[in-house]
Amino acid sequence: MAPVVILFFLFPTLLVLVVAVLGLRGGDDSWKKRGLKVPPGSMGWPLLGETIAFRRLHPCTSLGEYMEEHVNKYGKIYRSNLFGAPTIVSADAELNRFVLMNDERLFEPCFPKSVADILGHTSMLVLTGEMHRYMKSLSVNFMGIARLRNNFLGDSELYITQNFNRWKENIPFPAKEEACKVTFNLMVKNILSLNPGEPESEHLRKLYMSFMKGVVAIPLNLPGTAYKKAIQSRATILKMIEKLMEERIRNKKAGTDKIGEADLLGFILEQSNLDAEQFGDLLLGLLFGGHETSATAITLVIYFLYDCPKAVDHLREEHLGIVRAKKARGEPPALTWDDYKQMEFSQCVVSETLRLGNIIKFVHRKAKTDVQFKGYDIPKGWSVIPVFAAAHLDPSVYENPQKFDPWRWQTISTGTARIDNYMPFGQGLRNCAGLELAKMEIVVFLHHLTLNFDWEMAEPDHPLAYAFPDFPKGLPIKVRRLALK
């Protein structure tokens, strides 16, 4: 019998065995024997737990039926069986902060081996301790204020305007795809000095797209599956990185290297001893942080603004004011860092988009020891899922939380919606190193979008919470060019 046929018949049995093992893990009740007081909740089905209900598609601007029902029934902190493990789910902003601010002391990242295999075992998402801090420092240096001001700002504007010049009026196109082009080109230029349209850049883009599909796929390492293709794409990316590193080292020795530390690869070769696999894992992490999340946020802001013309008018007024002031001073039209810092309402729009869009809805952690919080015990070894979206959509924190209201951020410091309740990309040791880059990309995109276009939805499309927010149709839009003075 052919191996493929054997696998076909064995797969249902293997799946049942895997689910059974996961179910047994999820059924851990040793806490009862130890007299611990865990939060109320339900462990769901004996085998599957409540994972399917937890991951059921829902609008990314809501918590979803599962979370809403459980919070109403059990409170903001409850227990469940998710992803094959007993889990504490937190919709409580205080517990969320407590977990994130005690990373590595009381809690640690909790990813299955299948996820680590695809992300890379030296990925910042997986690493802990000194190596995590070292990789994080490289990322912060790469996406720090100095490079944002001197490199990313100008490159962002260049790639955004180049993309906009290709837009045709009244012809539908997917906004998500256009946002991805801009953010990907920006990152690979600053990481590897690859320019848009170059064969290596296009090859890397296709490999990365295959890689990302596997990150959110069922982890079946079988021929033809998205997960298997992602593993293969990662291996090809690492070979590509190794080749680029060797070429750069040869050029440096020959005195023909004209790039130096202008990109991340040059900086790594000069300032660290990372090997090709470590740099590849860093690259994939930075592409996710500086490309994937930024492209999603840009698409969300286009979506939200379409239903809020008052905000679009306010943005145009702000950006026209900056353009006219630059003209009056005789300055060139290219944006400066000072121009960017003046875009205060644009920052409010970004903050509101990240709050309502919930790009990172939750994270996975595991208790390293027994932890007590608000009268409850979190047993050692249990998973903990802080749900950031819960605070972002809490009516006791944000008035009318389902409404897109950028103006709320003009007075946010005086209300109940303190910055402590705002965690679009986490907090603490493992917060996103690319948050400021993402904000800048969105603001520069808004500057040129609102000054040059009106837009409308070509067909209905709404963001759903997959592993990350996404639009089933890619958010098809049509644009009309403006001639603002």
Curated annotation (Swiss-Prot):
InterPro entries: Cyt_P450, Cyt_P450_CS, Cyt_P450_E_grp-I, Cyt_P450_sf. It is found in: Membrane. Keywords: Cholesterol metabolism, Heme, Iron, Lipid biosynthesis, Lipid metabolism, Membrane, Metal-binding, Monooxygenase, Oxidoreductase, Steroid biosynthesis, Steroid metabolism, Sterol metabolism, Transmembrane, Transmembrane helix. Gene3D superfamilies: Cytochrome P450. It comes from the Eukaryota. PROSITE patterns: CYTOCHROME_P450 (PS00086). GO terms for molecular function: heme binding; iron ion binding; monooxygenase activity; oxidoreductase activity, acting on paired donors, with incorporation or reduction of molecular oxygen. GO terms for biological process: brassinosteroid biosynthetic process; brassinosteroid homeostasis; cholesterol metabolic process; saponin biosynthetic process; steroid biosynthetic process. GO terms for cellular component: membrane. It catalyses: cholesterol + 2 reduced [NADPH--hemoprotein reductase] + 2 O2 = (16S,22S)-dihydroxycholesterol + 2 oxidized [NADPH--hemoprotein reductase] + 2 H2O + 2 H(+). Heme binds at C432. Its EC number is 1.14.14.-. CDD domains: CYP90-like. It is a single-pass membrane protein. Belongs to the cytochrome P450 family. Involved in the biosynthesis of spiroketal steroid and saponin natural products from cholesterol such as diosgenin and analogs (e.g. furostanol and spirostanol), plant defense compounds used as main precursors for the industrial production of steroid hormones. During the 5,6-spiroketalization of cholesterol, catalyzes the hydroxylation of cholesterol to form 16S,22S-dihydroxycholesterol and, possibly, the subsequent conversion of 16S,22S-dihydroxycholesterol into 16-oxo-22-hydroxy-cholesterol and 16-hydroxy-22-oxo-cholesterol. This is Cholesterol 16,22-dihydroxylase CYP90G4. It comes from Paris polyphylla (Daiswa polyphylla).
